[in-house]
Each structure stands twice: as structure tokens, then as C-alpha cells.
Amino acid sequence: MKYLLGIDLGTSGTRSVLFNPDGEVIAAKSAEYPLSQPQNGWAEQDPQDWWEAAIATISHVVRQSGVDPRQIAALGISGQMHGLVMLDEKGQVLRPSIIWADQRTGEECEDITRLVGKERLIEITANPALTGFTASKIMWVKKHQPDIYKKTRHILLPKDYLRYKLTGDFATEVSDASGMQLLDVPGRQWSQEVLDKLGIARELLARVYESPEVTGHVSEEASRLTGLSQSTLVVGGAGDNAAAAVGTGTVRDGRAFTTVGTSGVIFAHSSKIAIDPKGRVHTFCCAVPGAWHVMGVMQSAGLSKRWIRDTLCQAEIAQAEKLGIDSYDLVDALAAKSPVGSNRLIYLPYLMGERTPHLDPDCRGVFFGLSAMHQRGDLIRAVMEGVSFGLRDSLEILDGMGVKADKMLLTGGGAKSAFWRQLLADVYARPLSLINSPEGPALGVAILAGVGAGVYQSVESACDALVRPGDAIRPDTGKAAVYQRFHRLYQQLYPALKQSWQELARL
């Protein structure tokens, strides 16, 4: 029997999962690592932490499964997108990785827009210049750390650094490369025009593959460290959201999913390229060769809930530890005591700036309507509602573009909360289906690995056979009507505060 390994490099940790050809989990292991925020709005991680987590989780899975490593036919890697990894001529990391959540590059985004032209940039890369994307991070290092930039010989994305450590190959694939702002997204190749205008050498970038293509095999050194066989193939893999799309079966028109992780995502498949000329949502190449996806991204989805838990719910965290339960269950119980609308309290979820729909690194979180009568449960529920309103903003933009999201699936850590699942259905005013497999991104890249190794004929046929959505979560029409009114007020708050946030950033 041939087995398939999926590795998911997230923001809070890495997870390795071994699957059989039927998509059943044979063994799994996770390992966490820290996030560094040396200044307000900055976010960095040490790539060595990723590699050590990969070694620990892969080796554990190989041992725990009892599978002959030679039977692991192929592996795929999913990862947090946009992070900048810079290597010298010896392949050594030159500085901590500036990751997706970092917001320091506002000036560099202005430079990119000026050098390429706003409309032309969107035509080529399908997106406006954004602080979260990789190109602005490269420009920041070039401007502020020129000595490091001069030593740079290879620029990689987070998951592709793991690929390099596993295989020795410098490679990436179209879905993740789309988030660098250096790819010709309609043409699925590096844009020489953008590279020339930004003064970035093509030689610094890795070769671009389609997601199911084989990019190499496990090296002798990686085999020794992980227990994998050198015969195990490594495929292109995918960025975290593109991988989740495969893992949730979102590989045909009309299919979409919501991810409530550290960030929040609304993602829809499209067999034809669709670009928002205002740049509010992102269009990337997807993991299905020859297709694309359109997605809206909010910076602080699950992050907002974790922040409110860590700030206000230390007693619940301690109680949950004693009871051996998830602290979020107790947090949800507090929120459930608050009515729809959180007693007229609205939360703006901009803890780390915002991407969709505002493209604003300076906006920050707000509680609007806070009064002496509000309790902890009101604040918690307001946070969950505010995140849900932010996700609905993306959904409305997709509807306006004609990108269908008829079959909406739900995944991510936030989807584990039954309370939040129902709340999302009520805010969206449409049914949701929970994915039965909790291993979305890892399963997605395992499927891609299976296609590359010849275990499956195509991405679509594999998803049809392996991925089954759960029962539908239907909206409460009465609550949905109330949320419609609250969402309209929510949408009025950003423009009212935009100038004030800009002034705050200058203080």
C-alpha cells in the first residue's frame, strides 16, 4: 500500500499527518513555536523553529505509524503564505522571516504602486500592493537592511524553506507564489516586468511548478533526520488556503469555504480568472492546474478570540485546565448568555490592521457602544460577531463579482465551536456545512502528493472520492434579520474612523 504525508506549516505550529489512499489518518503530530513581535505591527518567526518542528512531527509520525518508510510514496507541504525567507550563498538564513501578519511595509507598498502603476499591478499580479505580501517585505529589507539584501542569494516562502531542507531544491508552486506580488497570475509565471521595475533579480527566486508536480525527493540528510525514505517524492504543495481548498473539496465552480483560523478567509474556486479592479479581494492561482481562486482575507479572526480569552478569561483558562477541557468551551458559554447583537455592542476586528475590504495597515480594533452594563460575555460575543461581519464583507464582494459561493463549507480552529458555527450561518444568512475531516490543509497537500505520485488520476477525482461534507448548519431567519441591521451599522464605522486611525499612527 502507498501512503501519503501532508505537512502543514502554520503560524502557531506545524502539523504532520500520514494518510492511507482512502484519506484516513494513520498518524498525526503537531509541534508549536513562538511568534515574535519586536515592534507594534511587526511579526517575525525563526525558520529554524519551523524546521525543528517538521523534524519532530515527521519523525514521530513515521515511528508511530509503524509504516515502512519506503511505502510513503510522496509528501506535500502546505504553509502560511507571504512570509519572506532570505538565504545566503550557503543556504543559511540571513534574518528572521517577516511573516504574513507583519504590517511595517506601508511605504514600500506606496513605492511598488508608483513604480509599477496601480492598474498595471492589478492586471499582472491580480492584487494591489499590500503590506502582507512578500514583495513589499523584500523592498523593506532592501531599503533598511541593505547589507543583508546584498548577501541574499535565494528568496523562499515558508513552506518552500521546508522543501529546501527536505530536498535541497529551490522550488515553489503557483498558489503560494501568487501571494508574493511578483507572479504574472493570469500567465502562472514570474513577471519580468514587475521584477525589472522593482529592481529584484529573477535569479533570487525559485522555479515555479504547478501544485501536484513533483519538485524533488527526500535528501540523504533529511532522511537521516526524519526517518523518511529517500525514495519519497515531494510535490509542489500549496499555500495554506489553496491546500485547504483541496482538503475540503473546493475544486469546482460554485464551491467555497470559510476558514476561521488565526486569520479569516472566504475562498471560492473559479475555473475562469476573475479580478476585482478595486483590489479588495485577492485572486491567486489555485492548486488545480489551470484554475484560480478568489478570496477575501481578514487579519485577526481567531486571533481576536484568542486575545479576548487571554485578556478577560484567565479564570476560565485555569478552570478548563483543572477539568481537562478546552478553555474555549467555557468562553463560548459566557458568550451564549449574551443576546444577538451583544446588547448593542459592535467589535471592529482590526487588531493587526486589515486586508479585505479596507487594505489598511493602520486601522485598529474598536469596541463601539461599550457601556457600564456590558459584561464579559457581551464583549466575547461582540468579538465573535465582529469577526463574522468582517467575513461577510468578503462574501458580499464575491457575490458582486459573480463568483458563486453556493456550497459554503467551514474549516479552521474556530469551526470547532458549535456556537460560532451557528453564529456564522446566521450572519451569512445561508447554510454552512462542516467538513468531516479536521485535517483540511494536510489532507489537501496529501491529495496533491497522491496525484504527483500517480495514486490518483486528478485533483478533482480524488476530492470527489475522499472528501464528504457534514450536515448543513441552517441559519435562524429571525437572528439573520437582526444581524443584517447590525452589519449595516458595522460597515459605517470604518469610514467614520479611517482618518482618526491615520492620525493615531502618526503619534
Language-model-detected regions and their locations in the chain:
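A short local loop/turn or secondary-structure capping micro-motif enriched for an aromatic residue
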Residues: 34-37, 103-105, 302-303
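Active-site core segments that coordinate phosphate-bearing ligands/cofactors
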Residues: 5-6, 47, 106, 113-135, ...
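N-terminal glycine/serine-rich phosphate-binding loop of ATP-dependent small-molecule kinases
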Residues: 1-95, 123, 151, 206, ...
